[in-house]
Amino acid sequence: VQEIGKYRQQGKLVTDPRLLQRVEVITERLVAQAVKMRPETAKWDWSVQVIDEPKTVNAWCMAGGRMAIYTGLIQKIDPTDDELAQVMAHEIAHALANHTAERMSVAMASQAGVLAAGILSDQPGQTMVLAATAAKLAVDLPNSRTAETEADRIGIELAAKAGFDPRAAVTLWQKMGAVGGGKAPPAFLSTHPTDAQRKDRLNALVPKMLPYYQSPGARPSHPVRIGGSA
């Protein structure tokens, strides 16, 4: 909420009606499926903003239903509607799976372990540095990667059930990899799966998701507040 307020004060909330309508139509279909998956989220205050930050290739969704996407992602990735749906479905999946709260719990647990190691050592400064590194490698990074993998799985299903082509999840990450220039830390030092790992896993999910996408019938929408009203 504070982040959105900051961007509003800076005049960085996009008001272009065509772009806002595009984002609104996509997110309303995704949210309808999110509510089917977790009915209690019907009470969330679902809203989405487009933030004018051309250098930021990012999007997010918080528990409670507040979403945002940055113009840098739209401009640099140039996503199709199906690909843009995969982005937002992935972020909605993080909120549905409560990953923000899980990350806070993991961070608190690893910090407690680091502090305990420092207290018990006769060289507390050096020990705490080593313990912090070990905690990041052993706890924080694997948990972050697990959350990303789970969000990929939930997100591609949400998007397929909302009528968006699951094959776009693969092409999206091909584009993401191209924008990133192929530069990434080793997998064991990354909070995200590598692009290759991600594409392989998504490719494996596509055949299971195609029936949802190809299923006949109307795709419902759920109201989402759009633009400067959030």
Give the ranges of each region predicted by the language model.
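A Zn2+-metalloprotease active-site environment signal
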Residues: V1-A230
